[in-house]
């Protein structure tokens, strides 16, 4: 988890839409405009934190890397999951996440896609995935962390068609993301009942500038020297009435280092690359929205990992190409290719709750 103490000012404004209409707006896009050059909306100092999702097999929290092989449907044995041995003290399961500070989680929420400058099909069909994710059994793997087992807690809210000026260098900064998120949250709602997903179009990079203690961190497939992450989830508290906002950023995922293989996935490379990352960031946003809830706190190589970080797996091909390596799984009756999540209950990665 990283925190930025100060940020330049940004500005934004949302299309005038009544929040009450959003329950009926799931099948349409709400127009949204955000400008970086007018107004003075600010965030509360030290309130902007983020956790990045590293590249396949290259950076990040010790991913499992194996030679490429055929992708198969994943089958999880109930007998295995229900017979996890107890480790006698002082032993422990190194991957188990804890929440010693009782940080908040997302018990229920509306998901809000923000599509920047392109139609939703540019990224596949993220809204369909979010609907299926919220209605699936898989989402209940997270119940153990949020402490609630009720169904239908995560649903699709308003989706936004955002127009935003892209700089000449094709690189957005944190202030640009905050402009977009603030504009959407001003219309759609804020707090722990809303989770915004910002989708950046192909060819647009996103960077956290260098600081005195760390180099620049970027999604920049066109510049391998700074290409450090595929996506991230974050939160920030704005100093106006919008207040606290939870969000993730998914740049274009059908690029080397962030994608599933070109063949063998449930849908196609674009759809499943997008949905795999979206699942990763959504699960971590729910269980650790502000960076102070569920992650590995013990002092092992896994320290700092959130529950999705622990279950990333990549494959390397004979040509040296690296892809995410997961099987095909049904969500709400529709097939997808995406990663499992870590479960403290089974002390391992799983697609189904116990």
Please describe what each predicted stretch is:
Residues 110, 119-164:
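Active-site-surrounding "flap" and adjacent substrate/cofactor-binding loops of secreted or lumenal enzymes
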Residues 151-235:
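Active-site-proximal segments of metallohydrolase catalytic domains
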Residues 2-11:
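Bacterial N-terminal signal peptides that target proteins for export
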